Amino acid sequence: MFTVIIPARFASTRLPGKPLADIHGKPMIVRVMERAKRSGAGRVIVATDNHDVVDAVVAAGGEACLTNENHHSGTERLAEVINKYQFSDDEIIVNVQGDEPLIPEEIIKQVAENLAGCKAGMATLAVQIHDAEEAFNPNAVKVVMDKQGYALYFSRATIPWERGRFIQSRETIGDNFLRHIGIYAYRAGFIRRYVQWEPSPLEQIEMLEQLRVLWYGEKIHVGIALKAPGVGVDTPEDLAAIRKVFTEI
């Protein structure tokens, strides 16, 4: 059994009030919560800094925790929740992003099961990259891993660098590229330790929070997602695209 916590910060720079954005008659955060509830989680909690988000979640039959508005990351918000609820150190927590209303419930369960079956402090997922444009896109985070399935590095750069191929052309790629999906599973005790660590230099260079874990010598298990998630919502254009998808479901 595992618990899903959905961080939902209200003051998005590019899309203010994003958690409450209407998607086919329901707030986005409720759409995400409904997916999480179908994952097999024993409990689903929305962690937010906004009273209106709390009210929307509760009105939809969900559970919400009002958190400090000054957190620097979603992981810090998770830490506040696990301490408020006094979760045991062994409890598996899955961090589902609050702006992914199309996240497949299958992969929420998958990442929790992957963590339960490995020795890493943290687990996440990836999907194969087939398109050269995506491989060279710094907004698509790439990951390389060892033969046991543990992350060696995450980067916005194109890794691994196909030296022989890219000398000739960058219009095609091989089968060596994986895009990281922003879903994480951890044990509650690991989150408590994580937030005590100082940010790492690599994390600050790449602006990738997960690099702190590797910097401090911990392992991250990377599984290949059973199903690729749909687009997340970062901009008004993303929101329009998501609304169109829901009208067709």
Curated annotation (Swiss-Prot):
Main subcellular location: cytoplasm
GO terms for cellular component: cytosol
Recorded coiled-coil stretches: none
Entry's EC annotation: 2.7.7.38
Top-level enzyme category: transferase
Stored InterPro entries: Cytidylyl_trans, KdsB, Nucleotide-diphossugar_trans
A Pfam family reported for this protein in Swiss-Prot or TrEMBL: CTP_transf_3
HAMAP family listed in its UniProt record: KdsB (MF_00057)
Record protein name field: 3-deoxy-manno-octulosonate cytidylyltransferase
Organism: Photorhabdus laumondii subsp. laumondii (strain DSM 15139 / CIP 105565 / TT01)
